[in-house]
Amino acid sequence: MADTTGRIPLWIVGTVTGILVIGLIGVFFYGSYSGLGSSL
């Protein structure tokens, strides 16, 4: 964990990307079920 000089660890990139993708899909489905999907 100490050799992260100037480079983001791959597991952090994967975790953040996964959270963003899951959050985006969740917001999309929530908006479509709430009737707000057309405004997104």
Curated annotation (Swiss-Prot):
Keywords: Chloroplast, Membrane, Photosynthesis, Photosystem II, Plastid, Reaction center, Thylakoid, Transmembrane, Transmembrane helix. The chain crosses the membrane at residues 8-28. It comes from the Eukaryota. It is a single-pass membrane protein. Its main location: plastid. It is found in: Plastid, Chloroplast thylakoid membrane. It holds the Pfam family PsbJ. GO terms for cellular component: chloroplast thylakoid membrane; photosystem II reaction center. Gene3D superfamilies: 6.10.250.2070. One of its GO terms (biological process) is photosynthesis. One of the components of the core complex of photosystem II (PSII). PSII is a light-driven water:plastoquinone oxidoreductase that uses light energy to abstract electrons from H(2)O, generating O(2) and a proton gradient subsequently used for ATP formation. It consists of a core antenna complex that captures photons, and an electron transfer chain that converts photonic excitation into a charge separation. PSII is composed of 1 copy each of membrane proteins PsbA, PsbB, PsbC, PsbD, PsbE, PsbF, PsbH, PsbI, PsbJ, PsbK, PsbL, PsbM, PsbT, PsbX, PsbY, PsbZ, Psb30/Ycf12, at least 3 peripheral proteins of the oxygen-evolving complex and a large number of cofactors. It forms dimeric complexes. Belongs to the PsbJ family. This is Photosystem II reaction center protein J. It comes from Coffea arabica (Arabian coffee).
